[in-house]
């Protein structure tokens, strides 16, 4: 096989010439570490090339367009089908979680975002970590002090799957100021992957970005802005729990309509989104305010006790009775005329004594808390109040991206 013309092996422009025994006197001045053991000769690469291979600044390599994969609609449809099976539950804050709120989630997302940025991780690593966090919290109730551990372990797992240089457990412990011990990180890693049934690899917004960029090459120039927008949107759980294809469409639609972008290119991208995802692109306008909110420097959820606001105290009962009750009371106090006694036609037999009014069953049924059904119990009122707080977003089903076969 000719490796010089194939991408499967190294070419002569990057490989050193083979060292032989006859060349040792000439290369002894260049190579400082050369050992001869019988017929084996170990040579050291040139320092400049060795430094380029071991450079930790660039820890990612963008993939080139493969027309057999990224231009094939079957691969695109497979990603869309796969994302439906691994979508997180948007309502897990009210249906599963009892101790954490979107405020705690936003803090954890901000932390792993800073860690991924410090480690020069690809944007795909961070998106996969957020997906693992939301999927795990969709099925498992956790405590408040475990959210940082779960976020760090999710980034640890995602770096193993996506990063060329995976992060180690010691780095996660270091960035957490040793609040996440190494042994606990490994235990939580096993718990998360078993809870998710080892389905840790899921499509992200970048998976669909590559499909779109392969059809319009100018989209590659938007990768930096697209990565920033999609990563910032992960702070809001309503956007983060959308389908990755929907996140890609929202992010690319937002970036293409920035004032610095070409208007003709924005029209092409709009048509491409409509053709690829089979959706009305105008529906994406409803998500633009949420994206702008995520892009701002202010936190989305400003207080961790936003959902724990004290109930509004009711006004004290007035000691003065209403006029209607006073009139009714005056009517009751007036003596009523006594009718003349009548002879009973027959003697009434009293079989059962009437039940006292105080012991009768109330007209309204009682609930399990002992309160009347028209008055909520403290637990139920707390639950209703939590569902109507400021941090809970309006429940609206996002437009579904549907496929055409």
Curated annotation (Swiss-Prot):
Any Pfam family matching the protein: Cyclin_N
Disruption phenotype: Arrested cell division in the G1 phase during larval development. RNAi-mediated knockdown results in an arrest at L2 stage which is associated with uncoordinated movements, a slightly shorter and stouter body morphology, growth arrest and premature death. In addition, during larval development, cell division is impaired in P blast cells and mesoblast M cells due to an arrest prior to S phase. Lack of cell division in somatic gonad precursors Z1 and Z4 which is associated with a failure to maintain germline proliferation resulting in an abnormal gonad development.
UniProt region (Disordered), positions on chain: 301-405
BP-aspect Gene Ontology terms: asymmetric cell division; cell cycle G1/S phase transition; cell differentiation; G1/S transition of mitotic cell cycle; gonad development; gonadal mesoderm development; male gonad development; negative regulation of cell division
Highest taxon of the lineage: Eukaryota
CDD domains noted in UniProt: CYCLIN_CCND_rpt1
InterPro entries: Cyclin (IPR039361), Cyclin-like_dom (IPR013763), Cyclin-like_sf (IPR036915), Cyclin_N (IPR006671), Cyclins_cyclin-box (IPR048258)
Sequence ranges assigned to domain Cyclin N-terminal in this UniProt record: 76-200
Biased composition (Basic and acidic residues): 326-335
One GO term describing the cellular component: cyclin D1-CDK4 complex
Sorted UniProt keywords: Cell cycle, Cell division, Cyclin, Differentiation, Gonadal differentiation
Main function: In association with cdk-4, regulates the progression through the G1 phase of the cell cycle during postembryonic development. Regulates proliferation of the coelomocyte lineage and intestinal cells during late embryogenesis. In complex with cdk-4, involved in sex determination during gonadogenesis by regulating the asymmetric division of the somatic gonadal precursor cell (SGP).
Name of protein: G1/S-specific cyclin-D
Gene expressing this chain: cyd-1
